[in-house]
Structure formats: C-alpha cells, structure tokens
Amino acid sequence: MGIYIRDVVKYVVLVYILSMSRILISTMHRGDNYGSALQVYALSEILKKLGHHPIVLDYIPKRINLNKQVWGLLKQLFLPKSLGDIKGAIRGLAITLTNYRCYNTFFKREVSLTRKYYSYKDVAKANILADVYMTGSDQVWNSTYNHGIDSVFFLKFAPEQSRKISYSASFGKEKLDDWEKNETKKLLERYEAISVRELSGKGIVNDLGLPCQVVLDPTFLLNKEDWKKRSLSHHEKDKYVLIYSVEPDKQSVIQVARFIADKLNTKVFMVEWGHKPYAGVDKMISLVDPLMIIDYFLKTEFVVASSFHGTALSINLCKQFISVAQARFNTRVKSILEIVNLPDRLVSPAEFDLNKALCSINYSEVTQRLNIARENSMKFLKLNL
C-alpha cells in the first residue's frame, strides 16, 4: 500500500511539472555583482509563484569568463614585472575563485540553470527547447557594456515560431547609436511582447516602430516582507551607513558617506567584491551570499548608492538613501526615481548638501506608487505567459 501511494504521489508530481510552462531566461546573472544575482533570483521566484518552470540560460560572455580572468592572473603570477605583481596575483586568484564559489553556490541552491555556454554559437547549437523564451533584466541590450550587440540576449537562437518576450530588459542609455538601430529592430521584431526597465528604453523601442511597456526591475516584484523572509542574517552590532557602488572610482562616494556617518555617529560599511581596503571605510562586505546583502540593507541607518540595484533595493526596502550620480548610464537610476517621485535623491558629489541628504523620505507615497507599478508589472507577466 505504501509503495502504491508513493507511486501515485510521484505520478501527480510528474504531471504537475509537465503541466508547467518551461520558461528559458536569458539574462545577465554572471556579472559578479549582487544586483545581477538578486534580479534573476527574484524573477525566478515570481515565475515559480505564477505556476511556471523557469530555467536560466547559464550563458557566460567572454568579458566575464572566469577562465580568462584566472589565466590573466596566472600570467601575472609566473611572469611578474615586480614583487607587487606576485602579491597582487595571489590575492586576485584567491578573491576571484572564492567569489566564483560564492555565486555558484547561490545559483545552484536557488536557481535552475542550464549547462554553461560561452558563445552564441554554442547556445544556437544546443537547440534548447522551451514553451517561452524570455530576455530577462539588467543591461542585456547595452551594446557599450556588451562590446556590441549580443545576440544571445536578443534570443536570436530561439526557433522562429517560438514565443519570445522580454521582461524589464535594459539598454542602459538614452538612445541607440546609428550603427545598431537596424539590427536591433530586426531582432526585436521577432518578439511577441517587449517590456523594458527604463522610460528611455521605451522611447528607444517605440522609435523603432515597436510597442513596448515599462515594468519594474525583478527585485521589486518581491516586496519588503518577501525579502525579509528570504534574507540571511548577519550579526553586526555597530550602526552603519552602507555604501553600495559599482563605480571603479569610489572616493567621492566614500567622502559623501563619511559626511553622513559622522553626522549620524555611525560607521561606514561598503559592499566591495574584492576586500580592497579604502580610507574612510570601517568595514568591507565581500564574498558573502547575495541574500545576506539584503540583511545589510535592512539593518543599515542610511544607504549611499552609486548603482541601479543599490538604489532599487533602498527604495524597495524603505531605507533612507541618496544615489550618487555615476560617470555614465545614469538613465537607469533616473527612471526608477521618476517612477516613485524621488528625483531629488540623485545627487552629484560636487553638489552634495548634507542637510538635504538627511531630509527624511516619506515612504507612504513611494509605497503607493511602487504598488501600482508592481501590479502593472505582474499584469504584463500574467498576460504574456
């Protein structure tokens, strides 16, 4: 009898799995930053909640290929020009490999992945079958960032008659260069439904003569309570201002954070992938599980962000924050701040005003706007899946 019941349960589970739509997501998740990891995690969680079976295409472009990074460091180690090169290579190898293991553990635990692919040719040859092919979020359509148009992120490998949609894709800039307009249009014409993350992205797609909708970044599809339940706790006792920046030059961001921390009588913590020490920072947060980063956001007194996801998480988790303008690609941050009516939270270091920065954000209006945008974003997914 027990064996019979187990067989019935297995059969029911199998039927349920087979009834789920298999969605292949092509997104930028291997960028070695927490925002990229959290956005694909959130999208997968929501698609599962909607009754689908999301699978992430484990595509690793050349520019972020671990083998290439390790080979470069080994070359520096065995063909050094100075003692500093040797020390730097050893440190770099330790950090790179630990960082890879950290993200790999997270992805294996939380997200369904295909095998690894390293080129469009490899993906096209694989003939991966799915009910829906989806371009996911982050700067998948940014030709500057991707060193050209990356056909994998435009689903060129998907069968011609297959269903293709995008969710919260980003061009990361205000307009396309002339050289990429025709090819981008041809690739997007194959899509059944297009949604982008920024208002400027909608303008780009509309200018190509195609319909488009603005939706929220996937991290917003999980609300504050959702993230609280999923976060991994840290055990810091000190109060702190949190820096979340992906900018290479962090000195101006640190200076701003230091002003705020001194006023609030707190320490300064900074999320930094390589444990590199910075003057003015009391603690580096690095090589931890992406879901622990959420807890650092939840428990901070204030966030100084200089990235899209640093800004997005601050808003979604209802934190007091400012977003320091980056050297480029600020359109991403401007767009989300406009959606929640917080344009004044974007500041340049040269125009930083401590008193304005510390003006408290009233999250009642922000939450209302966010809930409306979240509902519209969910409607897009439900309608097109």
Residue ranges and their predicted role:
Residues V8-L385:
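Active-site anion-handling motifs in enzyme catalytic cores
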